[in-house]
Amino acid sequence: MCSAGRFILGGGGYLFKFSEVIKHKMTTKDIDFGYTSDHARKNADAVLPEIQCWPNQYKRDYNIKIELPEFTSVCPKTGLPDFGLITIDYVPNELCLELKSLKFYLLEYRDMGIFMENIANKILDDVVKACKPKRATITGEFTPRGGLRSIITASYDEKEGYGK
């Protein structure tokens, strides 16, 4: 939507007058947004720096919450930056995440074209692979784009696996 808020952008870069969309009851089926499966898969399986760990010293369950308030990535379709807060919330098992390597891992997303939904799921996969926690939840709270704010949450439980 342009700054005047009176046009919407359709596939192929065509602008549609918002009043015409309403008047003709144009739906999203009438507009080709141009997203492909290549866009959806882009960098979902990218190889990133290893997240290192250190031995947990306690047998009890306790929660570790790590926040990166200045997370950035790039939309694979538009090439525009995405900004957000990434929260890693986990209960360690035998290993804890080492913060410096985690920081370098997360910085790799800065210039990477990847959808927000893939970010939360990829970080979860890589955290689980690195430290095999009892439980982990990754939340990505992204700044609004086009007036819509996206909050993506992906979870893991060692007893139930991914999802419930």
Task: Enumerate the language-model features and the residues they cover.
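Aromatic (phenylalanine/tyrosine) cluster motif
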Residues: F7, Y14-F18
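N-terminal regions of proteins, emphasizing targeting and processing segments when present
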Residues: G11-G12, K25
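N-terminal intrinsically disordered, cationic/polar leader segments
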Residues: F18-K164
